[in-house]
Regions:
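Feature marks short, highly hydrophobic, charge-poor N-terminal signal-anchor/signal peptide-like helices
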Residues: 1-5
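Membrane-interface motif at the C-terminal end of an N-terminal transmembrane signal
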Residues: 12-28
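Glycan-processing catalytic domains of CAZymes
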Residues: 25-285
Length: 285
């Protein structure tokens, strides 16, 4: 009798496992690549540090510059990469008290943004900037929504003074556990939820984001490569779903501050998979 019960339990378990409802939430590579992949999909890593430009230039068509090594290096990186660029301007725009307080808008933010954009323009780098990024995870970092609205208006005011930025748009990555404040202002919208792995693609948060998109808005997917997540489901999903405009893996370089909690893609055994993913996108675009 015990053996019979065990067999019945095993049969039921297999049936549940194979059911579409369960399989939908199982981390796997079963998201198939579409027959007609996109030709305009963007692929590039969140932020940049160390020798990332030379290490990734052969398999990205998107560059994300966060100025982690200062303005001079940022300009050099953008010129060397010569790809569609997302430029983080938080260094010019925001300040905070201590290491835990909210970010507030600097009184002289406009002057600093214009001065930096002028340096980029004079160096011939500004023409590569297609998206401006006021600050990372604004729903988790900025003082309040009013502050973010002011920052967004300031970015557009500064950009209006440069012919290279005619038609420039905004990009954002939100924290997953809080409302997407000011989402309507951004053309490229993403959120990070690394614990969900590829299940994030069928999560309620993703469905809500997709349903809330306005005209001209697209989603960027953020696979957690630094945490061992396979890029394949994200690339396949991006190619199969019209609302996805970019895949922005986190994180190529090795963060030694301790905030990431793991090595980057370049060193954690995931490098080959992400290089192949990038080349699959760039070969088509």
């Amino acid at each position: 009798m015990t053996l019979l019960i065990a067999i019945l339990c095993a049969v039921i378990a297999v049936a549940v496992y194979k059911s579409s409802g369960f399989k939908r939430w199982r981390y796997s590579k079963d998201l198939t690549f579409p027959e007609a992949p996109k030709r305009d999909l963007l692929y590039g890593y969140y932020s940049c540090h160390d020798e990332q430009v030379s290490e990734t230039k052969d398999h990205v068509n998107l560059f994300f510059e966060s100025q982690f090594q200062g303005q001079d290096r940022a300009i050099q990186n953008i010129l060397e990469m010569s790809r569609t660029t997302i430029l983080d301007l938080s260094a010019q725009m925001f300040t905070r008290e201590g290491h835990t307080g909210p970010f507030t808008l600097r009184d002289d933010a406009l002057l600093h943004v214009i001065a930096f954009l002028r340096r980029l323009s004079d160096a011939g780098a500004l023409k590569h900037v297609k998206y401006l990024y006021p600050i990372d995870e604004p729903n988790n970092t900025v003082q309040d929504e009013t502050t973010l609205r002011r920052a967004i208006a300031l970015v557009f005011e500064a950009a209006s003074q440069f012919i290279e930025l005619r038609g420039v748009r905004l990009a954002v990555i939100y924290a997953a556990d809080k409302p997407n404040i000011c989402q309507d202002a951004y053309a490229l919208v993403g959120f990070n939820d690394y614990d969900m792995r590829s299940h994030v693609l069928v999560s309620d948060k993703y469905k809500q984001l997709k349903a809330s998109l306005g005209v001209g808005q697209q989603i960027m997917l953020i696979p957690g490569g630094a945490y061992g997540q396979d890029p394949t489901p994200f690339i396949n999903f991006a190619n199969a779903n019209a609302e996805v405009g970019a895949v922005v893996p986190f994180l190529w370089f090795d963060d030694h501050t301790g905030s990431v909690g793991s090595l980057g893609i370049r060193s954690n055994g995931m490098k080959d998979a992400y290089i192949a993913a990038g080349k699959s996108v760039c070969a088509i675009s």
